[in-house]
């Protein structure tokens, strides 16, 4: 929330601000910090030195973002850094080093990697610093303090049951704290002087032990004792003290402190605040006085004076943004560059020793692709770099505003307990208490509240100042989780109380992480907006306060799954945030300058002001990651005058600058012949032929033509039906605009048969010799569905483009340096076996499919009410109102009271009142104005609509909110009045065309030889447990035997059964055990159990033992 003092108004911050600010901070400051802190590298003789300059350059991308999507490339910029080589402290030579490519973030806060949009999810980890805890055991209490370093290392101090103080290195290794003190260079006088609670050391005989004093008097001796107590002994279980061993242990101890005791600036800040220290923030390593203060406070906690920490509190957690993650990866890449340069210098020194003369530094590789490799690995494999959910614009924003508790340095799904997943009071105004995934990640993935911001790694929330003694301070104050503990903050779902009403003198307030009722005079701050606590998805749900939290969670998640419809429609009932979501999504085309529209068509808008021409390119039928349509429709006519910031074109699922995810349709809550039982939904055929829920989906087909393998693209495909090739042009490519069916060829390809084909099928060689056929094989690309071809992209694969190197020539003095970098870059690509002649070609075919709603599709509302279409009724059979209008959808009324999402009823009735071209924008928690405010508003609007339309059935006093409707089949009135109205219904991405899957034969598991599970593996057709129960209930023994043996996992029998079915013969019996039975016997054998059976002859009663 931002406050403009001149206009005295508040504005909600941009929803993508956190991502954009984080990446800008990485480019401007974090990269600079890495190059400034890059150490000077020198050889052993100090003859050659290398160091980076801080004036790095990032070249503008040579390709547009749209072209990078088509060519499946990464939208990135090349990074060039000046470096200096100093020879014998005299000769100084400057070189420009190419360090790789850095992917760029677009205006939506996402990255384009290999033609796919990806997003880096923010992470919440434990903040570096010191944390105190109490472990209760049967024998007594153990007080511990854990020091978390900046790189994630931990150091644990503890007071055991016997009041002894230890530093624990691992679970089984601990050292006395006094030994650690002496190893850090302290003596007994300094320890006693700087420790307030000296009684904590009285239990030790160490202070009075003269022998131990003498042994620990020297620092190296203390370090020796430190590792001796850790158990670092040789094979003979004895330490042999020597100077070389002492030096080795000293280096080991120094490395130990640098790895586990590096606090960083944030850790130093937290340590100073917790222990009341005054050490500068630039001192990022642990000091001896820090350890003294840590132990002193630990003793204080054991006496009950200090307080233990709650690790789930947000003040103890750090927000890891995209800048922090990228900075960490660049640091790893620069470390590899450092090793590369050191190895090169060692090679030069060896050459110098062999030739016995001074050698100038030869061609050190002026190109290093370490940053490219590291960032490629990060964006491709890191768990926080995720494939962008792009079903609609709301899904993009919500995905970029997610915060993960998982990932490196965070929690794990298995070890995260209920306490870590639960809602903490410090989340108030920072994390949404509702929006989280369903399933095993529940509580581990959070979503930012709409007004939260990041400051120095911590989340802050704005509050309005109402205290009289703070009137001269700012009206809007951002408080961190550690600051709002000391203030009384009134909740946002209440208004300024009327002191004349005794019942309203106390206000619900948050104070010291608890929710209390406090008088208004004692309030310091208050929330300024009821939506301040929630995420964007939850804030779009009207009448949110009347829904159960779990249903609000489902409604928020299902809005992300809504498919953009062909004809978007504004919701009649909303919350007022729809325009802000559309504006910040990046899907709108916004005017960048004031002027008059000179030219406008479906793809381009040109505006002119005082001779300055601005051209805006629109998205035309582009594919998203979820195969939905991304398209912009212009509503800026020619010669129209526009202002800066005015909307020129709407994006997908948008209308008039507002996000429109669904359609306003007429619904009724009533049972209908059992077709809407449970979550089934009955719809009218009007939704189909009026294209109410019709959506476009774009599928991308891709194929590669490798000319190195003599693969070619052609229309002449032998032994293939001409009908399937009817859409190909002379080059073998499908024509744009063609209507293709499943099985039609999109790209005609031929390649020579390999030697493996002839060895696998010898008859191919015989046919070639007999009939003189050409040894070729068709590898055509075929369509899997029907649709219209809207685009064909035929491009050649190139390893890189050197044109952007020329853009670095900003100074004449550096032109020759960039020429050297260009030559070195070409050498590196040749060494990596990149073929610069581009011997491969790639073809992308985009198929547009128009999908109407049908049986099996999933639809939902914004209140967690979801269901599957079970039947499509004709218009005349649908129930109709007293005005003759037939219903569009019939929902089950039993789904409302059991799930406690009454908000859909308020929306439905208010939507009926808003059919007279009215739109309502109602923020949640309107009950803060008066009791039953929502109900009064709905009934009042219904009463007004009844009078304006002269339809008394809209508002009937006998049954408020209900009306009598007629059966479309008989024309009779239903016995009971029914709740009817206009609800905003969404069509979800879960559609029957994508879910339907069937197979006859397919892949089998290697061990059990049973069909694999899942559509993605090509599996299916399994006889499950419930199907076996059904067969058992009917007693079909022979069918059960077939299904469980010869038709399941008997390899030889299931091959014979197909032939027997075709020939009409009886089903063959299994002559041996099935594969799953063999697996069972082997598992029993592994348990030392032998499985066998015995046959008893009926005539002679002989025993014949047969092993399985």
UniProtKB/Swiss-Prot annotation:
UniProt main location, coarse: plastid
InterPro entries listed in its UniProt record: DNA-dir_RNA_pol_bsu_ext_1_sf, DNA-dir_RNA_pol_su2, DNA-dir_RNAP_su2_dom, DNA-dir_RNAP_su2_hyb_sf, RNA_pol_bsu_bac, RNA_pol_bsu_CS, RNA_pol_Rpb2_2, RNA_pol_Rpb2_2_sf
Chain coiled-coil ranges: none
This protein's GO CC annotations: chloroplast; DNA-directed RNA polymerase complex; mitochondrion
Gene3D superfamilies for the chain: 2.40.50.100, 2.40.50.150, 3.90.1100.10, DNA-directed RNA polymerase, beta subunit, external 1 domain, DNA-directed RNA polymerase, subunit 2, domain 6, RNA polymerase alpha subunit dimerisation domain, RNA polymerase Rpb2, domain 2
EC number: 2.7.7.6
Record's keyword terms, sorted: Chloroplast, DNA-directed RNA polymerase, Nucleotidyltransferase, Plastid, Transcription, Transferase
Location of this chain's protein in the cell: Plastid, Chloroplast
GO MF annotations, alphabetized: DNA binding; DNA-directed RNA polymerase activity; ribonucleoside binding
GO biological processes: DNA-templated transcription
Role this protein plays: DNA-dependent RNA polymerase catalyzes the transcription of DNA into RNA using the four ribonucleoside triphosphates as substrates.
NCBIfam families per the UniProt record, alphabetical: PRK00405.1
Protein name as catalogued: DNA-directed RNA polymerase subunit beta
Organism of this sequence: Gnetum parvifolium (Small-leaved jointfir)
């Amino acid at each position: 929330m931002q406050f403009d003092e001149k206009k005295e108004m508040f504005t909600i911050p941009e929803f993508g601000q956190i991502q954009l600010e984080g990446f800008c901070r990485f480019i401007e400051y974090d990269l600079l910090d890495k190059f400034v802190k890059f150490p000077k590298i020198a050889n052993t003789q100090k003859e050659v030195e290398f160091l980076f300059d801080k004036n790095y350059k990032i070249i503008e991308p040579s390709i547009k973002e749209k072209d990078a999507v088509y060519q499946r490339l990464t939208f990135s910029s090349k990074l060039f850094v000046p470096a200096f080589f100093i020879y014998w402290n005299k000769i100084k030579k400057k070189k420009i080093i190419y360090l790789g490519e850095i992917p760029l973030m677009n205006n939506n806060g996402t990255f384009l990697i290999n033609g796919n949009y990806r997003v880096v999810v923010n992470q919440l980890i434990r903040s570096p610093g010191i944390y105190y805890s109490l472990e209760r055991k049967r024998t007594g209490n153990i007080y511990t303090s854990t020091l978390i370093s900046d790189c994630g290392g931990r150091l644990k101090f503890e007071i055991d049951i016997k009041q002894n103080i230890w530093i624990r290195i691992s679970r089984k290794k601990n050292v006395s704290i006094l030994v650690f003190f002496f190893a850090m260079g302290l003596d007994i006088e300094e320890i006693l002087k700087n420790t307030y609670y000296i009684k904590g050391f009285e239990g030790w005989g160490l202070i009075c032990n003269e022998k131990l004093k003498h042994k620990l008097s020297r620092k190296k001796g203390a370090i020796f004792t430190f590792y001796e107590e850790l158990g670092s002994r040789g094979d003979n279980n004895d330490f042999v003290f020597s100077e070389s061993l002492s030096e080795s242990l000293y280096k080991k101890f120094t490395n130990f402190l640098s790895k586990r005791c590096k606090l960083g600036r944030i850790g130093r800040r937290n340590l100073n605040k917790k222990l009341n220290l005054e050490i500068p923030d630039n001192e990022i390593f642990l000091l001896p006085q820090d350890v003294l203060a840590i132990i002193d406070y630990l003793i204080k906690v054991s006496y009950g004076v200090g307080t233990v920490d709650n690790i789930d509190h947000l003040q103890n957690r750090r927000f890891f943004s995209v800048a922090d993650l990228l900075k960490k990866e660049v640091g790893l890449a620069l470390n590899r560059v450092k090793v590369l340069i050191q190895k090169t210098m060692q090679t030069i020194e060896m050459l110098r020793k062999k030739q016995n003369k001074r050698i100038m530094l030869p061609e050190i590789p002026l190109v290093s692709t370490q940053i490219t490799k590291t960032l490629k690995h990060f964006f491709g494999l890191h768990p926080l770099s995720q494939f962008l959910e792009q079903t609609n614009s709301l899904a993009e924003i919500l995905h970029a505003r997610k915060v993960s508790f998982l990932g490196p340095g965070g929690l794990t799904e298995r070890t995260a307990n209920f306490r870590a997943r639960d809602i903490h009071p410090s989340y108030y105004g920072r994390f949404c208490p509702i929006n989280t995934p369903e399933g095993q990640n529940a509580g581990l993935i959070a979503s930012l509240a709409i007004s939260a911001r990041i400051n120095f790694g911590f989340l802050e929330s704005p509050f309005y100042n109402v205290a009289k003694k703070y009137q001269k301070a700012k009206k809007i104050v951002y408080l961190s989780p550690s600051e709002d503990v000391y203030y009384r903050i009134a909740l946002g779902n209440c208004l300024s109380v009327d002191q004349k009403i005794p019942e309203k003198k106390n206000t619900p307030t948050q104070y010291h992480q608890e929710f209390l009722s406090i008088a208004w005079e004692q309030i310091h701050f208050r929330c300024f907006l009821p939506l301040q606590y929630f995420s964007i998805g939850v804030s779009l749900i009207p009448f949110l306060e009347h829904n159960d939290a779990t249903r609000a969670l489902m409604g928020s998640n299902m809005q992300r799954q809504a498919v953009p419809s062909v004809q978007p429609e504004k919701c009649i009932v909303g919350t007022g945030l729809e325009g802000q979501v559309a504006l910040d999504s990046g899907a709108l085309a916004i005017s960048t300058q004031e002027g008059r529209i000179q030219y406008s068509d479906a793809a381009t808008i040109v505006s002119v002001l005082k001779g300055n021409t601005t051209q805006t390119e629109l998205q035309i039928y582009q594919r998203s990651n979820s195969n939905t349509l991304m398209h912009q429709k212009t509503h800026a006519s020619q010669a129209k005058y526009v202002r800066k910031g005015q909307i020129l074109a709407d994006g997908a699922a948008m209308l008039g600058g507002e996000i429109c995810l669904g359609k306003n349709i007429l619904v009724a809550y009533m049972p209908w012949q059992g077709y809407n039982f449970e979550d089934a939904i009955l719809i009218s055929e009007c939704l189909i032929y009026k294209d109410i829920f019709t959506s476009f989906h774009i599928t991308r087909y891709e194929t590669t033509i490798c000319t190195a393998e003599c693969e070619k693209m052609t229309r002449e495909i032998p032994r293939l039906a001409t009908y399937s090739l009817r859409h190909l042009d002379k080059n073998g490519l499908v024509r744009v605009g063609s209507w293709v069916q499943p099985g039609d060829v999109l790209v005609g390809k031929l390649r020579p048969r390999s030697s493996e084909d002839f060895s696998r099928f010898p008859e191919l060689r015989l046919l070639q010799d007999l009939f003189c056929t050409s040894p070729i094989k068709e590898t055509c690309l075929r369509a899997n569905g029907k649709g219209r071809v809207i685009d064909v992209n035929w491009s050649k694969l190139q390893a890189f483009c050197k044109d952007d190197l020329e853009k670095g020539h900003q100074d004449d003095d550096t032109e020759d340096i960039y020429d050297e970098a260009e030559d070195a870059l070409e050498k590196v690509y040749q060494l990596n076996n990149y073929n610069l002649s581009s011997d491969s070609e790639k073809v992308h075919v985009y198929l547009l499919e128009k999908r109407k709603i049908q049986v099996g599709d999933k639809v939902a509302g914004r209140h967690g009410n979801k269901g599957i279409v079970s039947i499509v009724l004709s218009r005349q059979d649908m129930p109709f109102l007293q005005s003759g209008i037939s219903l569009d959808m019939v929902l089950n009324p039993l789904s409302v009271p059991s799930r406690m999402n009454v908000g859909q009823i308020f929306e439905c009735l208010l939507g009926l009142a808003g059919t007279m071209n009215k739109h309502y924008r109602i923020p949640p928690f309107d009950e803060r104005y008066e009791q039953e405010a929502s109900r009064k508003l709905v009934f009042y609007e219904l009463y007004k609509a009844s009078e304006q339309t002269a339809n008394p059935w809209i508002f009937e006093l006998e049954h408020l909110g209900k009306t009598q409707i007629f059966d479309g089949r008989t024309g009779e009135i239903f016995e009971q009045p029914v709740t009817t109205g206009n609800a905003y219904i969404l069509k979800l991405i879960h559609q029957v065309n994508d879910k339907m899957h069937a197979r006859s034969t397919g892949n089998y598991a290697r061990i059990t030889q049973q069909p694999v599970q899942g559509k993605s593996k090509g599996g299916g057709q399994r006889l499950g447990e419930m199907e076996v129960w059904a067969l058992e209930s009917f007693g079909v023994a022979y069918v059960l035997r077939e299904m469980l043996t010869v038709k399941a996992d008997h390899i030889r029998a299931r091959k014979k059964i197909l032939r027997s079915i075709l020939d009409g013969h009886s089903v063959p019996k299994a002559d041996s055990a099935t594969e799953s039975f063999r697996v069972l016997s082997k598992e029993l054998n592994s348990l030392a159990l032998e499985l066998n059976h015995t046959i008893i002859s009926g005539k002679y009663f002989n025993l014949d033992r047969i092993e399985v």
